[in-house]
């Protein structure tokens, strides 16, 4: 596999920023389809792909979501062209006969809800990370958030209880004039060990 050009890494990581203020530029549904059709190829354990994505765009849906957000996240969520609820399916294992057909992977999870939930959370978190990187690759800015009332999100958007929210991410075209100076990151020596 070839190494990507430095400019690509800059767009995805080095120069990419978390955005909180959004330009009034719409994101069309075709781009959201392209985004998902990219994200779905990211690896997950046993190809389980438990993440489910709810793209909140309409004013009516935003008005349902905004009260679920913490105070500091409400206006940015209202303003963003799209807000994605990154969720996970607590019955993802029912899809494994289709997604991982060469072994009986469904049996690894059936009847063990704690194992299902742990695997769903871990793998949907991976997929949420892929969403951020794929969105940046497609020219979108991202604003992932953890400040929300999960019970309220679940009750509002997933009342049957099968899907559960993991995290929430605003998408669109950010106002680069409003980003804060970049915060520091840990060095390799602080964050890594080579054994």
From Swiss-Prot:
Its cofactor is FMN. Keywords: Flavoprotein, FMN, NAD, NADP, Oxidoreductase. It comes from the Bacteria. Pfam families: Nitroreductase. InterPro entries: Nitroreductase, Nitroreductase-like, Nitroreductase_HadB/RutE, RutE-like. It is an enzyme of class 1 (oxidoreductase). Its EC number is 1.-.-.-. One of its GO terms (molecular function) is oxidoreductase activity. Belongs to the nitroreductase family. HadB/RutE subfamily. PANTHER family: MALONIC SEMIALDEHYDE REDUCTASE RUTE-RELATED. This is Putative NADH dehydrogenase/NAD(P)H nitroreductase RSc1004. It comes from Ralstonia nicotianae (strain ATCC BAA-1114 / GMI1000) (Ralstonia solanacearum).
